[in-house]
C-alpha cells in the first residue's frame, strides 16, 4: 500500500506547517503494559463528503483539479511580499511558512491587510519532503474535505525543485506552541476538551475514509481564532488496509514519543496506531508535559511511562494534571479523560477503541461541562479503571531521534 498519492513515503524528518518535532526511524520494543477498559460506543456521523482515495493521481491531473488553485510562483511571491523574512510564521526541516494575502473571491494576490490571509509553505530544495510526498499531501487534501482538516487552497510547482502549498491561515498556530512555548497563556480546561474533540473528529473522519494519518501529534494540530482544531501535514498518510488485509506494512516513520509501539517494533500500522498517538496527545492536554522531556531523568523522561500508574486511579489522577490549570477542572471529567487516554494507550492494538467511540465519549464529556453533571453511562468508565504496579509496567525504550534545527516565529 502507498500513501494517499499511491507510493511509499520515505521521509526522515518533516514538520507541521508551523512547527514540528523530532522523528524516529529506528525500531523499538513494545511499550508499557496497559489494561483493557470499555469505552462507550456510538456510531460516527458526519455530513462531510468522503472522497475515494483509491486511484493515484499525477501532477498533470492535479493541474486539472477543480477544488485546488494552481498558483504561479510570481503570484505567491507577490502575496508574501517577495517572501520577506518578517512574513515568516514557521520554519522546519521542510522549509518555511509565510503569511500571505489573496483576494477571497478571485484568489489573486492582494495587498497586506486586505483580502484573505493564507499560509504559504515553501519547501526547501534539499528539505525532507520530496516531490512525491509533496504530491501526496496535495492529493490527500485536494480530495478530503472536512471542517477539522486544514484546508488546502492551492499549490505551485515550478521546475524540478520549487514546490509550494497554500493553506488557510490558522491564527492561533499549533497546539504544541500553546502547551509548551515559554510564556504561553495557559489553556483552560474547557478549551482543552474542545481541542481534543476537534482533533478526534478529524481523525475519525480520516479513518472512515480508510486513511491512516500516521503522524498525529500536537504540532500537527492547528487552531483557528476560536480554538477549533484542524489536522495538518498529510505527507505520511497511508491508504488502507483494504480487502482481507488487517494492516499496512511500511517503513517506520513517525515522531518520537507519539508512534505506537507495535508500529515501531514491526512496521505494521493500522488505524489503531493513530488511536495510540491520540492517547499521547490527550496526556499532553491533561499534563502539559512533553512526550519526551530530556530535562528529566528516569521514568519521568517519558510521558507515557510516567503517567500510566495514575491514569486508572481516580484518587491519583491529580498527580498528572497540568499545574498551570490551577486546579480549575472537574475531577470527574479529568478522570474520564484520563481513562480515555488509558484505553487509547493499550499495548494491544485490538483493545484500543475506535476513534468514533473516543469522539462520542469526549462529546458527552463536553455536554456534561455545560449541564454540570456526569451521566451514568460516562460514570461507568471512571468506576471501571485499573491501576498498575511497577512490576506490571514495561518502560518504553526511547530511540535516538533524528534531530533538526527548529524555531517558530509568529506574525500578528
Curated annotation (Swiss-Prot):
Domain of life: Eukaryota
Entry-annotated residues carrying Phosphotyrosine: 167, 263
Organism: Arabidopsis thaliana (Mouse-ear cress)
GO molecular function: ATP binding; protein serine kinase activity; protein serine/threonine kinase activity
Ranges in a coiled coil: none
Documented EC number(s): 2.7.11.1
Protein name per its UniProtKB record: Probable serine/threonine-protein kinase PBL4
Residues annotated with Phosphoserine modification: 219, 249
